[in-house]
Structure formats: structure tokens, C-alpha cells
Amino acid sequence: MNAPAILSRLLVSAVAVMSVLATMLPAFAQDKGTLDPKPLPPLTNPNDPHLAAKQLFGRKTLPTAGAPRVIGFYAKGCIAGAEELPITGPTWQVMRLSRNRNWAHPAMIALLERLSAKIHKDAGWPGLLIGDMAQPRGGPMITGHASHQVGLDADIWLTPMPNRLLSRNEREEMSAVMMVRKDRLDIDPHAWTPSHLAVIRDAAKEPSVERIFVNAAIKKALCREAKGDRSWLWKIRPMYGHDYHFHVRIKCPPGNPQCEHQTPPPDKEGCSARDFAYWFSDRVLHPKPPKVPPKPKPPITLAQLPADCRQVLAAPDAKQ
């Protein structure tokens, strides 16, 4: 087999593996929580240079004291001085409290509070159900996400908040509603409503929002149904999974020089057949596992994160 053919086969296998993994990971947010979360056991050798950084950050239950500071990239960084989104607000409720992932930069906290109030008015929802944001000090997570590391990402359920206070048990047990048809080619018309478009549109029109990740079938519906001003559609990016929630990512806040910016998405609607060709291809919708399973990718170590993340881990807890 010649070199181009080998390369082509490797690329196809890699895409298949990515498709399988990416469709599995978002399902984690649908996993049920517990009313009695057990603390993780102490690490035998926390200074082991080969230890996965997620084991260190996953054991921090409180943020650092001091001013908020974003360090690194969305998928490779941490945050100092994170703030906690109150678990219940006038127009939002936090889900899966046992995960302790309702922390973020104050800019994200302000966005969620403002956005939930706007959606209550524009979409008629009682409020938003908020999923994973970040850990108290950000960093890699033991389960679930590759990003959400610097306090600038948040998952919002596509299920309206009930018009009542959810119990702690309901917040651990309740599941979000699947928005995508079983064939993955379009939204489920029995679940999707015009209010869902209004919710995502309101989020996309926020100036601080840089990207919103949704399933390709949801992006397809938005392209089809959006009327009038469509200038916000370019922020909506198709992604594996994301079929019962959408993922909001905001820009690096001013005054955070250590925050690594992401290249903005192309300034176009992204609604052409060419834009959807990959996402609705057979290799993505029905990926075949490679004949030889790939070796697991080594986890990120503390040495691979920005140097200041070591200080974030060592800093004293903020007073509660």
C-alpha cells in the first residue's frame, strides 16, 4: 500500500474513533448524580510528574482567594478566584449539584443571570436549567469534558426550567429532553419548539458569547427557521453530541492577559449543504470502529498546563 493510501486509511480511522468518543462524552451530562457524594481518596503521591492533572483539580472543592484570573486555553488551563453561580435564582436552577461544577469567571456568572432573565421574557420559559460550568479551580475534569477548564464555558439544558423549585433529588435524577430525531438528520418535531430557537438566538446575540455548540441537526433547524436578522447564526457551531443541551463559550474577559484566545469562527451563516456535508455523512452518523483499537491518549499532566496553574492548585481556599 502506498503512502497516500496509508494516510487516507489512518485519517478515516481517526475520524471514526473521534466520532465514537465524541458522541459518548456528552452523554455523561445525562448521567444521574447522587445525594451523598463521597470525597475522592487522598492521592498516594500527588507530586508524581506523570499523574494526570485531572486527579489534582478534581479533588479541589473550593476556589482560591483573590481576584478572578483566567489562565490558559478553554481545554488546557485553570482559573483563580472563580465565583459560584447560586444554585437557585429567579430564572435559573443548577442541575447535578453533586458534581460541584457551578463555578466560573464572574463574566460567565453575569451572563447566565442576565440571559436567563431575558429568555424568561422572550421565550416564555420560567427559566434555565444550568448544567456543567467549571470546577472550583477549573482544570481538567476526571469525567466528562475536554474543555470547561477556565471558567468560560457553560452547558444549558434545552429543557425549560419547571415553574417550581426542584428538589435536590430531582436535580440529580431528572434527565433533559432529547431534541434530535433517531436518524440524527433533523430535530424531533415532538420536542423542538419555536421557543428553543428564541433561547439559542438570545444567547448568540450576547456580545461576550464567542461560540455556541449544538448538534448539527439543531443547527440545521436554526438555519431553516431563523427569520429576519440572521447575523447571529455564524456563532452556532455544529458539534458531536449536544443534542439535549447547548454549550455556551464566552470570549476572554478584559484584564485577563493569560487567557488564550480562540480563533473566531468564520463570519458566515454556515447553513449551506457544504457546511452540513461532513456532519450528515455516513462516517459520522454511523462510524465503524477501527480494526485495531487505538492506544488511549495520555492524560494532561500538571507540567503540560500553564505554569501558574501549579500556583492555583497550591493556593489556600477562599473563605466561604
Regions found by a protein language model. Give the residues of each.
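Active-site acidic/histidine clusters and adjacent loop/turn architecture
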Residues: 66-130, 192-202, 206-209
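Envelope-exposed proteins and targeting segments
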Residues: 124-129, 150-154, 208, 242-246
